[in-house]
């Protein structure tokens, strides 16, 4: 245990997701040993992000303007909408360079244990986006866990009367993975989602 501002810094860093006490301590001592200009720049960037970044008025992704760059891009296919839980999921899908539609960020997943219900998510905004009939396919890309599955099922039932095609991301074995280490659910999904091998 340290005293004063050093311990305050360690405590604050430890509040960040994925940062445990040891990592917080390492980062704190890195900051202490860093050049003052680097520390000042880090502090400025943190403040700048908090002041300038907002959520896109259309999809809920992070943005510096009213619309994010994806919603503002006329080359994106407006007929395909990919629903994700968080902005970080948009980044993950964009890295594939395979998806050319638009997104809708829910801001989480249904989780009764955590007190998060449908009204706590951006589901009302999703329905408003679907109302004009432009979207023909809704891809549900929520996490493949209990909360993500519950959210996907809820949305699929909610959207069904609108006549929009609803699809779910395939799930299964990772590339380079070994079958013996796959859990039963993952292996079962991989079998369900199998496809013909064209040679």
UniProtKB/Swiss-Prot annotation:
Q: What keywords appear on the UniProt entry?
A: DNA damage, DNA recombination, DNA repair, Metal-binding, Zinc, Zinc-finger
Superkingdom of the source species: Bacteria
Keyword Zinc-finger present in the record's keywords: the answer is yes
Q: Where is the Toprim domain?
A: 79-174
Show the GO MF annotations: DNA binding; zinc ion binding
A GO BP entry is:
DNA repair
List the protein's name.
Answer: Recombination protein RecR
Q: What species is this protein from?
A: Acidothermus cellulolyticus (strain ATCC 43068 / DSM 8971 / 11B)
